[in-house]
Swiss-Prot record:
Reactions listed under catalytic activity: L-aspartate + NH4(+) + ATP = L-asparagine + AMP + diphosphate + H(+)
The keyword DNA-binding is assigned to this record: no
Pathway in which the depicted protein is active: Amino-acid biosynthesis; L-asparagine biosynthesis; L-asparagine from L-aspartate (ammonia route): step 1/1
S-S bridge residues: none
Cross-referenced PROSITE patterns: AA_TRNA_LIGASE_II
Protein name according to UniProt: Aspartate--ammonia ligase
Amino acid sequence: MGQLQKAKINQTQKAIVEIKNRFQKYFAKNLNLSRVTAPLFVEGQSGLNDHLDHKQKAVSFYAKKLNKTLEIVQSLAKWKRLALLDYGFSLYEGLYTDMNAIRADDDIDEIHSIYVDQWDWEILINKQDCTLDFLKSIVNKIYSTIKTVQLEIDQLYNPKQIILPDSITFIGSQELEDLYPHLTPSQREYEFAKMHQAIFIYQIGYPLKSGYIQSIRSPEYDNWNLNGDLIVYHKLNDQAIELSSMGIRVSKQDFIKQTNFANLKNDQENNFYHQMILNDQLPQTIGGGIGQSRLCMFLLNKKHIGEVQVSVWPNEYKDELLKKGIKLL
């Protein structure tokens, strides 16, 4: 490795630390969050793992001394809601944690890796807060945090390299389809993100008028009428990048409606988490995840997520990127 490349990588590593430290500090303050320790794995039969679109299989292993099969978490969407109850948080207090996951079935490209690192967060709220206005208020706080860190990182490393608007643009998934009826959901995201630079698409899960779904969502945690994705336009790659997904969590009624719609009722009787929802034992919350590596990639204006995180990539893939001057960590 040449000295110039080594210096570049060292600067990137320092910048990653700066981004993560600054973001966590402002994020916790703006949303009234306390940092907690989170599990790397959970019991396979507990129902606490996130099964995403119910097609991606969790990585599992057998723990001999426990005589149990454990699963590497795919996200902490369910665990966090239970943790707020167990840890005795008060109204409008919340938690955040470092979530490290392995998603063996994920795609591999410039923004996808089988290793996932994100800040998972959850806040205790009132049932009266289950509105789009409240969801948008939380989105604005998160976006404000991202914008603050962007300005500070630009001053330290790349002045005016990444420009984010002062405010984020909101749009419903159906409104987005009406705007671009001839495009696919991902194409709509790209066009709208390119136009506005930072967007939040809300109400994701149910079919649109066309019969298509904006993006497949698990029916078990977000209320599909009160959720959404925070997306930015990455000019270097000419690409829309989802930095965060979040939502107000399901009530008993939401859960029944959504699982019936998704035809995922079969395991409810034996699922600890499902039973807690059906028995109204979980608090009303809002929560989500923010991709750490994606945020770093975007703010540092990198072409590939592998420039800011260590994962495993095919050798021929790494060689091709190296020819383009992209060195993966």
